[in-house]
Amino acid sequence: MSGTSWLQFAALIAVLLLTAPALGGYLAKIYGDEAKKPGDRVFGPIERVIYQVCRVDPGSEQRWSTYALSVLAFSVMSFLLLYGIARFQGVLPFNPTDKPAVTDHVAFNAAVSFMTNTNWQSYSGEATMSHFTQMTGLAVQNFVSASAGMCVLAALIRGLARKRASTLGNFWVDLARTVLRIMFPLSFVVAILLVSQGVIQNLHGFIVANTLEGAPQLIPGGPVASQVAIKQLGTNGGGFFNVNSAHPFENYTPIGNFVENWAILIIPFALCFAFGKMVHDRRQGWAVLAIMGIIWIGMSVAAMSFEAKGNPRLDALGVTQQTTVDQSGGNLEGKEVRFGVGASGLWAASTTGTSNGSVNSMHDSYTPLGGMVPLAHMMLGEVSPGGTGVGLNGLLVMAILAVFIAGLMVGRTPEYLGKKIQATEMKLVTLYILAMPIALLSFAAASVLISSALASRNNPGPHGLSEILYAYTSGANNNGSAFAGLTASTWSYDTTIGVAMLIGRFFLIIPVLAIAGSLARKGTTPVTAATFPTHKPLFVGLVIGVVLIVGGLTFFPALALGPIVEQLSTQ
């Protein structure tokens, strides 16, 4: 792999470290308990109109159960709206190519997918969805589903920071502030940058062009830049086009690719700094940042290195896969030459470490070990750095589990940020940890046993199993990326992956809010010499170990039957 690839990696880390603290401080002010918020003069009047129309009292706060019901109610409304738009898109405006209504099972899957911030797509975007559906349905959900995840995180942090409190904030107020004060401004800036790098933004249908051979070719158009900006910033990932950010109209230049990769990561990393500021101990923010960063960097290096080695079967045929003056080297199957294996592998680690799921290369064409990296990264629970809000939720749950284990080892009641971790919290942590693996492995096992589901594979043997595993891993972790060799646009896959997405969203959000409510009611214990410090390298290593052991022990048998066996068969 060329030195340029490593330079891009180092530059991305540097830019993230420069920008994340500033954004994190801004986020902490938005979600903090202070009355004055940044942007009150601009956004305050708009928010007041929204509160009046929706009959929301911005001065009232909610208990965790009411907060959870608000999240559920909003999600149900979002699902019904998006499902209705997709089913009736044939009679709705901004449909220049007269696309018909989306079929029932595809509409169900798409509505669940975008409502849960998964953005799994069993359809081809430019061939299935009209501009109206893309703009008013999918793009709107990109904003609000990501914002809902950030609201849940804000509630959890308040639960850790407050003492003997019964409320966690107001979901509707948090949602309005997140969309208006965070997502809109960031998306506007990123969209302008993407347009400057050749990403299209128009309301055209298909344009007919004549190729050099004289045959006509249909060139799609659409409001792409505005949707790509929020799909990356909100770690949504659903592409306007079927090949997602591998399409030049979504991701044209290496600079644009860099901007999009930064956009995927910036909010999850910035939330670490917001966390440290909101709990009044910046060292805690640096600790969770270190945990996220170490895992993400490790996965990125692994993906880039495995793909740089190339396909071992081509080595046996004497094919040169080394970096030369006229090729970037490595396994270039399924990759864009303008990015090469370095930027592709880095993106793969970033998109699966978050809940993003967008791709600039085809993960199904990776080498067995290269493809195992994004698969395993999702199986860790997407905590490095995780999606907008939900990633840090998961990491804080793992931190609670880590301090519980540490407490058992020394015979002391475990504490996190001065709050005692007791049976109530651990039952909820257990539910959180078990929900995703149960959904993933149950549906994957059922699909292996059903002949019609097996028929959707384009590859037999261990790689076919990897395709099925990847689909349910992506759905249950609300990621959305895919091994595209699996034909998932069938009734069975649309339905079961849809259910997996619902479990992966709400069976995690509700326990997190319950944990937040339980912790908020507690007081804090004073720090003593026996208190386990949660801001030092020992704690960082312990949490990383818990994340790797929980993910590794749960999914290693499945990985052994899929990518590991496939790798051994290529030797």
Swiss-Prot record:
Transmembrane segments: 7-27, 66-86, 137-157, 188-208, 255-275, 286-306, 390-410, 430-450, 497-517, 538-558
One Gene Ontology biological process: potassium ion transmembrane transport
Location of this chain's protein in the cell: Cell membrane
Record membrane topology: Multi-pass membrane protein
Top-level lineage group: Bacteria
GO molecular function: P-type potassium transmembrane transporter activity; potassium ion binding
InterPro entries named among the record's database cross-references: KdpA (IPR004623)
NCBIfam families assigned to the protein according to its UniProt record, in alphabetical order: kdpA
Protein name, entry field: Potassium-transporting ATPase potassium-binding subunit
Source organism of this protein record: Mycobacterium tuberculosis (strain ATCC 25618 / H37Rv)
